[in-house]
Regions:
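Electropositive, gly/pro-rich neighborhoods at or near active sites that engage anionic ligands
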Residues: 1-65, 223, 227-238, 243
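Non-transmembrane, aqueous-exposed alpha-helical and coiled segments at domain scale
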Residues: 31, 42, 117, 139-140
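Active-site gating loop/helix substructures
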Residues: 38, 42-102
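Active-site rim loops that border cofactor/substrate pockets in soluble metabolic enzymes
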Residues: 62-77, 128-148
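Catalytic-core regions built around general acid/base machinery
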Residues: 87, 112-120
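Charged helix-capping and loop-helix junction motifs
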Residues: 108-115, 141-146
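C-terminal functional extensions of proteins
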Residues: 140-246
């Protein structure tokens, strides 16, 4: 649950005194592998400029506004830690994950320092495309639209790979369970996407999950994390092999 996860993180931040310490504490509790670094320790406000030129502040308000999003930016310039910038500069692979395009993914790119660090790295950029469009954010978006939008917010380096679903999604079931997170299955316009200089990696990535609690049962569509992990690792290993044998 997204909201519950946010509440747990906020509670831990209050206990630990900083976002980084909170993440370290939760990582130990959950026995997480790898390193998780916050985008910033600053309190920043996400701002959306809508297609009617209205300025809307706050993630929730941006998504709920009845017009399409034209652009997003921060009201304040975020301070980025040297540790995070160094991790980006020395990375072999930069993964832009699935999630709300304008209010979850792109906000991580809204910093000059982050863009510069990405440009200085030798990493390839991989985008894992969502299964569905999101109401209020990506209505009518195809895979190529996601790539074009991301490239607008990146610096000199652009998306190199996209992982996209080619598995069939039951349209009736999808309509029945459409909600604020998922609307229409995203169409892969492969030829148009490849013309953007992106290598398209595909598979049947659909995983249907039943959420049940005391009050109701809900069906949600998710990525098959086993297949997704395999594809990401394959891209990473292929690129590492290429660098080694240059």
């Amino acid at each position: 649950n997204h909201s519950l996860g946010n509440l747990i993180i906020l509670a831990e931040i209050k206990l630990q005194g900083s976002t980084q310490k909170a993440i370290e504490s939760l990582s130990k509790i959950l026995n997480l592998k790898g390193k998780v670094l916050p985008f910033t320790e600053d309190k920043v406000t996400l701002v959306g400029k809508m297609e009617d030129n209205t300025i809307v502040e706050g993630e929730h308000n941006i998504t709920k506004y009845p017009k399409k999003i034209k652009a997003v930016y921060y009201k304040e310039e975020p301070t980025i830690s040297d540790e995070l910038l160094n991790e980006i500069k020395t990375a072999n692979l930069i993964l832009l994950s699935m999630g709300s395009l304008f209010t979850s993914v792109i906000p991580n790119l809204l910093s000059k320092d982050i863009k510069t660090a990405i440009d200085k790295s030798t990493a390839k950029i991989v985008y894992c495309c969502n299964l569905f469009t999101q109401p209020g954010e990506t209505d009518d978006y195809k895979v190529s639209d996601h790539i074009k939008t991301l490239n607008k917010y990146l610096g000199n380096k652009k998306v190199n790979y996209v992982i996209a679903n080619t598995g069939e999604i039951n349209t009736e079931l999808a309509k029945k369970y459409s909600n604020e997170e998922q609307k229409d299955p995203i169409v892969l316009d492969k030829e148009k996407t490849e013309k953007l200089g992106v290598e398209v990696i595909t598979d049947n990535l659909v995983y249907i999950k039943e959420h049940t609690n005391t009050f109701k049962s809900k069906t949600v569509f998710r990525h098959n994390y086993v297949k997704l992990g395999f594809l990401i690792n394959t891209i990473a290993l292929d690129y590492a092999y290429m660098l080694k044998n240059k």
